[in-house]
């Protein structure tokens, strides 16, 4: 009887190993073993401006899976479910590309199966995209923000195994995702004016994935009735009687006055801005000058 029990135990062990044949890991080595589970995936976000969608993250470079027994078992893998974008992206819809086909995101149904039949780690073919909205601005994402929760479902042709591999996708870096079809050369530009009464060009350009009419307007606290001289906000030894004024091709630009750039395409277009000193009234005294001026883009 003892020999029978031992033989049965060995046979049971062999059946368990061969039936559970699928496991996954992340690019940094975090694993979800045979039988499923959950893991966090920290991804570096590098958005780009594309026509119709802006890439948020390509998970095919981050998640890999394999089949331990391809001779006897074929594993089938789907994207069973994908959550809405988390945090600051929760109000935006998008798409998910799975094995070359695009689906709504958040997902509305399970995707078709992808076959895993090799011991070699194979990328999980998932990429998330954000659908543009009617703004040329962007959404700031902080490192550590939850981007999405994706559920990989694994079945096979051997038995009734049905396992879930849950991937919590987090941003690994601070980034601004452009939510429109256009983007700018820099989101924070600092220029240094020479001594009074000097001026300096502002190196700011904009480009779009496809040609569209674009404009912009300036915003900030102004010190004059014409809303064109921005207040000196220097906190240390500020100059008196002077502020900052922006011009375009020699023409003064008041705050909240839309400037048309015309058709903007894939080639960067300069905003043509120059920063200048401007008198606000009263006696001018020496000191520091600083102004913070916002630029907002609009589709026309």
From Swiss-Prot:
Domain of life where this protein originates: Bacteria
Localisation per UniProt entry: Fimbrium
Entry-linked Pfam families: Fimbrial (PF00419), FimH_man-bind (PF09160)
Signal peptide positions (record): 1-21
Cysteines engaged in disulfide bonds, as pairs: none
UniProt record similarity statement: Belongs to the fimbrial protein family.
Function: Involved in regulation of length and mediation of adhesion of type 1 fimbriae (but not necessary for the production of fimbriae). Adhesin responsible for the binding to D-mannose. It is laterally positioned at intervals in the structure of the type 1 fimbriae. In order to integrate FimH in the fimbriae FimF and FimG are needed.
Name used for this protein in its record: Type 1 fimbrin D-mannose specific adhesin
Originating organism: Escherichia coli (strain K12)
Underlying gene: fimH
């Amino acid at each position: 009887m003892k020999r029978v029990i031992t033989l049965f135990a060995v046979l049971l062990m062999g059946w368990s190993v061969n039936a559970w044949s699928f496991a996954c890991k992340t690019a940094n080595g975090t694993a979800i073993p045979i039988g499923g589970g959950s893991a966090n995936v920290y991804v570096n976000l590098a958005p780009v401006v594309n026509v119709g969608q802006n890439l948020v993250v390509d998970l095919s470079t981050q998640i890999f899976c394999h089949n331990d027994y391809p001779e006897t078992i074929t594993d089938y893998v789907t994207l069973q479910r994908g959550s809405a974008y988390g945090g600051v992206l929760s109000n935006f819809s998008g798409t998910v590309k799975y094995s070359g086909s695009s689906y709504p995101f958040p997902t509305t149904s399970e995707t078709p199966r992808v076959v895993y039949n090799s011991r070699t780690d194979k990328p999980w073919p998932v990429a998330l995209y954000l659908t543009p909205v009617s703004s040329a601005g962007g959404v700031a994402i902080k490192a550590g923000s939850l981007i999405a929760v994706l559920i990989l479902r694994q079945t096979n042709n051997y038995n009734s195994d049905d396992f879930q591999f849950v991937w919590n996708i987090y941003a690994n870096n601070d980034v601004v995702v452009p939510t429109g079809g256009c983007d700018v050369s820099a989101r924070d530009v600092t220029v240094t004016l020479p001594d009074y009464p000097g001026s300096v060009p502002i190196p700011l350009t904009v480009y779009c994935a496809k040609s569209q009419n674009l404009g912009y307007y300036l915003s900030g606290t102004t010190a004059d009735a014409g809303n064109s001289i921005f207040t000196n906000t220097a906190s240390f030894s500020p100059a008196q009687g002077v502020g900052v004024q922006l011009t375009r091709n020699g023409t003064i630009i008041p705050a909240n006055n839309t400037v048309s750039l015309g058709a903007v395409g894939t080639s960067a277009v300069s905003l043509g801005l120059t920063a200048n000193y401007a008198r606000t009234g009263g006696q001018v005294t020496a000191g520091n000058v600083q102004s913070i001026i916002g630029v907002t883009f609009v589709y026309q």
